[in-house]
């Protein structure tokens, strides 16, 4: 593997262990030329997943789109980056466990909302307001009422 510091290809693995998510392997490497250390992750290659958009267009699955939406929803909330990454990992695992080659974007959105609802109600409402495209205040208020009713059960 090429060293990210000096560009030489003489590197060796000095430590290898399962990563936090147990679906990848974290490897600590050292360059034989410059002696600097760096970390790499090895992950199982998954079958390519295609997302069916609302307009029926198809595009390759892109984890960063889910991350961006969740990060926006959690902005200025007491939610750590680790919690957000764990949520996105859960969403991704759920999607891949469907074992479908094509997944509608609305299914992905529902999975994200389900995970966000249990993490933070405000982040959930923020995500839902964009995802569900609330047309007016009444629709927005109805969704808030559902959340409040659910919390008081």
Swiss-Prot record:
<dbReference type="GO" id="GO:0008270">
    <property type="term" value="F:zinc ion binding"/>
</dbReference>
<dbReference type="GO" id="GO:0005524">
    <property type="term" value="F:ATP binding"/>
</dbReference>
<dbReference type="InterPro" id="IPR055173">
    <property type="entry name" value="NrdR-like_N"/>
</dbReference>
<keyword id="KW-0862">Zinc</keyword>
<dbReference type="Pfam" id="PF03477">
    <property type="entry name" value="ATP-cone"/>
</dbReference>
<feature type="domain" description="ATP-cone">
    <location>
        <begin position="49"/>
        <end position="139"/>
    </location>
</feature>
<dbReference type="GO" id="GO:0003677">
    <property type="term" value="F:DNA binding"/>
</dbReference>
<keyword id="KW-0547">Nucleotide-binding</keyword>
<keyword id="KW-0863">Zinc-finger</keyword>
<dbReference type="InterPro" id="IPR005144">
    <property type="entry name" value="ATP-cone_dom"/>
</dbReference>
<keyword id="KW-0678">Repressor</keyword>
<keyword id="KW-0067">ATP-binding</keyword>
<comment type="function">
    <text>Negatively regulates transcription of bacterial ribonucleotide reductase nrd genes and operons by binding to NrdR-boxes.</text>
</comment>
<dbReference type="InterPro" id="IPR003796">
    <property type="entry name" value="RNR_NrdR-like"/>
</dbReference>
<keyword id="KW-0804">Transcription</keyword>
<keyword id="KW-0805">Transcription regulation</keyword>
<keyword id="KW-0238">DNA-binding</keyword>
<keyword id="KW-0479">Metal-binding</keyword>
<dbReference type="GO" id="GO:0045892">
    <property type="term" value="P:negative regulation of DNA-templated transcription"/>
</dbReference>
<dbReference type="Pfam" id="PF22811">
    <property type="entry name" value="Zn_ribbon_NrdR"/>
</dbReference>
<comment type="similarity">
    <text>Belongs to the NrdR family.</text>
</comment>
<feature type="zinc finger region">
    <location>
        <begin position="3"/>
        <end position="34"/>
    </location>
</feature>
<protein>
    <recommendedName>
        <fullName>Transcriptional repressor NrdR</fullName>
    </recommendedName>
</protein>
